[in-house]
Amino acid sequence: MYKLVLVRHGESEWNKENLFTGWTDVKLSEKGVSEACEGGRILKEEGYSFDIAFSSMLVRANDTLNIILCELGQSYIDVEKSWRLNERHYGALQGLNKAETAEKYGEDKVLIWRRSYNVPPMPLDESDKRHPIHDSRYKNIPKSELPSTECLKDTVARVIPYWTDKIAKAILEGKRVIVAAHGNSLRALVKYLDNMSEEDILKLNIPTGIPLVYELDKNLKPVKHYYLGDEDKIKAAMESVANQGKKIDR
């Protein structure tokens, strides 16, 4: 039996402001730092330790991981970072307020942009400074692979090869693995692991900073999964994620 721990980064400054973030590199909020500390504390209390960690190229996930590893006294373990674990790219929506966008275009349309499996938002033009081709951290990645926008299907297409080539390989080698990433890159992985339908994945809300444990059999098929922490807090956190795209109350 293997165990895999997944953690969505703690609340970021743009999460706090309810903005579409995507590949924009935004730091953790004060609350996000606290969430990461709490996640690390819970993992320590439950006796978890790790041999290798995987994360994205974005600071909010990297800092969450660093805080957790510090709480565990394991800052020394190997960390592998990849753009394939980045958040879904939200195209021209990046930087816009989710609730105000819902007021302008309607909740149904924003829900489709946020959560549909195969409908991406409007793309960024390559001349836009927000496009990842202008970010030096991606200079070694072919321009053709860097997205202008993504739907969840696109995110799955880049996450799963990384799971197979890197993460699953490490687990099968007997390494204890933690992955600190993002709401949609983790949803892509959960969809694959649990063989979820396109419809069911739309309803999945992964809360920030709360460790999600998967117990896997010898073929890396899930036996069960569960969050660590207080059940009421977990439920409230999941509801908070679900409410992000709703219109502003007047």
Swiss-Prot record:
Pfam families reported in the protein's UniProt record: His_Phos_1
Reaction it catalyzes: (2R)-2-phosphoglycerate = (2R)-3-phosphoglycerate
Keywords: Gluconeogenesis, Glycolysis, Isomerase
Residue numbers annotated as active site: H9, E87
EC primary class: isomerase
GO biological process, alphabetically ordered: gluconeogenesis; glycolytic process
Site description Transition state stabilizer, residues in chain: H182
Entries under InterPro entries matching the protein: His_Pase_superF_clade-1, His_PPase_superfam, PG/BPGM_mutase_AS, Phosphogly_mut1
Binding site for substrate: 8-15, 21-22, 60, 87-90, 98, 114-115, 183-184
This protein's pathway: Carbohydrate degradation; glycolysis; pyruvate from D-glyceraldehyde 3-phosphate: step 3/5
GO MF annotations in UniProt: phosphoglycerate mutase activity
Disulphide bridges: none
Function in brief: Catalyzes the interconversion of 2-phosphoglycerate and 3-phosphoglycerate.
Family as reported in the entry's similarity comment: Belongs to the phosphoglycerate mutase family. BPG-dependent PGAM subfamily.
NCBIfam families: pgm_1, PRK14115.1
Protein name (database record): 2,3-bisphosphoglycerate-dependent phosphoglycerate mutase
